[in-house]
Amino acid sequence: MAMKEIKITDFEGLQIGNAENAEAATGCTVLLFGKDGAPAGLDVRGGGPASRESELLKPMAAAQIIHAILLSGGSAFGLDAAGGVQKYLEERGIGFDVGVTKVPLVCQSDLFDLTVGRMDVRPDAAMGYAACLGAEHNNYRDGNYGAGTGASVGKMTGMGTCMKSGIGSYAVQLGDLKVGAIVAVNSLGVIYNWRDGHKVAGMLTPDCKHFVDSEDVVFADYEVVENKFVGNTTIGVVLTNAAFQKTQLCKLAGMAHDGYARSIRPVHTSADGDSIYAVSLGKLAADQDVVGALGARVMSEAILRAVQSADAAYGLPCAKDFQ
């Protein structure tokens, strides 16, 4: 059966929007799931996540659907942006009906970009609302946009030897089955091309002319590091038109982390907040393990596209500079 590439927006019941402040080097990306919402799961592997409403996605939680996912910069400060998404959805009568109003269920994960641009400007409710307006036209783009505006990679020795990254996406169709991924790449580790194993972006030598292997730096000294650089976190979403419930989607999110592991080294560290959501947007019957394996593959490709589509900015070089 032939597999073909499709757009990340080629899923029914999905709208994706970006909003950013390019001068301040921060932004957010929203995924809206319509009036009916969508089942979702979450798997967090990093040691330092910044998140909102993540408890909703645990298998024992009562909620079976959510209405939106927001990926954002700003670290924990950026969690304010979800308020704008809630406002947008409430105005349109979207949410969990509690009689007196409808409460939109909005999950959010943030990355750390405070050291790239202006630390005093972070995604807020106004920016979250603007991302929703952008989603009406599916204004999503890969690169230095949305949650990827201030993203960077390879920060083992700090910002002076890291590179610019961004947000990326990739989706495929296999028969009637669709699987896609969107990811903002902001890792401590180096990014590798999952297809051939070559370094694409990451930690550089002091003169910023050559790549350094972050794992070699880690292995060179096993003593406890008190001031490890913590400004990291890769956050992503896997999408499918196959029908799954929350427990199954948590497993799919876990399998998608294989895509992180193929592309980022080291990954899932105590200085990262690596998280992946999985969302079901259809009724198609499909094998969970097949979708999980595809989820890992599209996530790896989305990571690659996130760094390949990024442009040099804020004094940071990009992968295009090393081609």
Regions found by a protein language model. Give the residues of each.
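Active-site catalytic microenvironments for nucleophilic, acid-base chemistry
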Residues: Y88
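A structural signal for small-residue-enriched, beta-sheet-centric alpha/beta enzyme cores
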Residues: A2-A76, D80-G83, E91-Q323
